[in-house]
Amino acid sequence: RELLILLRQAGCQKIFYGVDSLCEKVLYSVGRKYDPSLAMENLNLAVSLGIKTEMNIIIGFPGETERDRVETLKNSGRIHKDIDVVVNGLWILPGAEIYEMALRDGFNESYWLSEHEEAIPFYTGALSKDEMHGWIRRCESYFVLQQRVHK
């Protein structure tokens, strides 16, 4: 709270939160040990201070279920309507812990040595690529209906 107030007093006009999920189970499973309620409180506070606020949601974390994704959507109803939401699939990049998980699940490391349609691969351990893109579209549609998606 105090940091947001100081940021605003210093002239901060826009902030982007890497929330990733509003489902506590998912956050803890990927080492993001914070309470989604606190994230929502800070998002709402930023808006109330007049700071343009954006957050991201990531689809496709390992072990994430449909119920977890629905929980994130339901919880997003508790944040201010002026918060823009960016929805992405889970990318994997060398050096990240999720990259090591993908390798253990059979991701072919030679991907980086060949040409692909997508510069950065999506991790599809929890969902097929088509399912992931379907959920991204579903989430974007949900947020468009609330007039707060930012692509």
What are these regions (language model features)?
Residues 1-150:
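A structural motif corresponding to the C-terminal lobe/cap of the Radical SAM core domain
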